[in-house]
């Protein structure tokens, strides 16, 4: 098995193991976005996903690649869209099919989508590309390009290299101690900057690419120090958090990096 395949395998097995945790986190999110660092960060992403869905005409077709427990498929259906998903982790797939029986959800991987050319008006990859090595990321983006219609939209999240939560430095320290860029017992993580994310999408054929930042990184640290402290300060800091990441120079320090591109219309 090649390094790229091993990284992909570990990611799938990890998400198979944590399916019940994801389901519980999303249940908590329905009650309060401040429940955990996970729910707070996902609420930021979900707000942008909802904006994307609202920009589409009723009946438009969306594909959620790595759909997990199916939460974004439910959001799409509530907006009057046609929703399809693909998920390789067996436990995640089972939960998604149970949660969203009205959506078409296939067993498959981002690098080989089980759909025809030009089937969708939008493709989203939420916290998927971060777990793949570079060759698989390129393949996944090419597959998204293939299944999108002219003028279709792509929405992906990536891990910001210089996020103020210090995750990149933490990962680098672990790699140096283990003298390896990949530990087969833990999921891989590939970091990007706004500039590298923009170039990545442009090189795979997307146009009008823009990047956004969401989530003040230190809020994650506060949750880890003390969950109650994290919840309290997240409520206080949220207005500042949202304002801060509207500025172009601050997005490189955000906890979540989002890249949005379009298919050429011609």
Predicted regions and their residues:
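Acceptor-substrate binding/catalytic loop of class I
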Residues: 179-196
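Conserved class I S-adenosyl-L-methionine
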Residues: 2-57, 59-66, 155-177
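A short glycine-rich, Lys/Arg-flanked "PGG" loop and its adjoining helix->strand segment in the class I
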Residues: 138-150
